Amino acid sequence: MQKFLSLIIVILILYNIVKLKISPDNNNPTTIEQTASNNSSTDENQTSINNEPHISLNGNLFERTVSKIVINALKTEEGKAFFENILQPLNGPINPNDYTIEVRKDLVKTLFKINTLGSGNIGPASCGHVVTVFYQISDMNNTLISEDTKTFTLGSAPVMLGLDNVIIGMMVGEAREAIIPAKYAVNNSKNIIFDDAYNYKVNVILKSILPQNFVKNNEVKIYDDEIAYRVPLLCGEKVSFNAKITRLSNGKILYDSKAKGQQIDMKIGDITYPLIFSYALQGKVTVGTRSVIAEGKTFKALGSNINKIISHESLPINEYLLLELGDFKQN
């Protein structure tokens, strides 16, 4: 039923786009301005109160109703993430042995409206890294609320959970500007409190990353066997899942939580788990199986010699391994 509704919505969206493309341009700016100038004073007052432009909807009652739902949904961050997803292939499992949907879309960047400025050559920062940043947080009217230089572990959310996720992927020296939706303004500090009823603007500059163990985007391949319209997992959130690690050179299974009969319960960014786990989980929608091909060195944990999954001594660090993550349950 969910797939059918998704298909209907996508068809209606495409249908309306085609109608707009082939229909005469009766709503050009000049016509709109002329019509507006002839409106009554009551209409002008109403327009001044509501700054959003009026959208004329065509079609039958059902088409207009669906169009209104789509427009209202796109006004929310979750709604935008929803449509970012359904405009990719419709969610549905494919052959579990044939991972053909390569992950290219970063839903986290869409969710936080991230804009990157400048460049750097050290990084990128992953969930679990210790970073030093300079940040500024303002309200949506650009009134400065907080600014500081702070060192913390990504995922610990000492300032704002959304800030941690904006920093993910940054290089040292880069700057980013973003908008943090209200629900991600939470933190684990008793000294910093933000009203979770409002969105916030963030500017951040990355000054340093420790340790300098990095997962390079061009050295890792990530595939999903299913795509769905949900808000993705974020750095600092908790999730349960099954994991399987296979050595590609000979097919030897190095770890399998399902065979052990116990799911992994992990906070994304936990430095006692392999770095590649946090890298692969951040931004993942909790359906299907995510398959990751990466070098063994990325399976090291950031926290000294502690690795809850596989000992560093037994890791083939210079070989490629296959990591499979599935059976997700968000805590």
Curated annotation (Swiss-Prot):
Superkingdom of the source species: Bacteria
Any GO MF annotation of the entry: peptidyl-prolyl cis-trans isomerase activity
Q: Which residue intervals make up region (Disordered)?
A: 28-50
Pfam families xref list: FKBP_C
Stretches assigned to the PPIase FKBP-type domain: 128-226
Substrates-to-products reaction catalysed: [protein]-peptidylproline (omega=180) = [protein]-peptidylproline (omega=0)
Which EC number applies?
Answer: 5.2.1.8
Matching entries from SUPFAM superfamilies are given as: FKBP-like (SSF54534)
> Which keywords annotate this record?
Isomerase, Rotamase
PROSITE patterns given for it?
FKBP_PPIASE
The UniProt entry's GO biological process terms, in alphabetical order, are: protein folding
Q: What is this protein called?
A: Putative peptidyl-prolyl cis-trans isomerase RF_0616
Q: Which organism is it from?
A: Rickettsia felis (strain ATCC VR-1525 / URRWXCal2) (Rickettsia azadi)
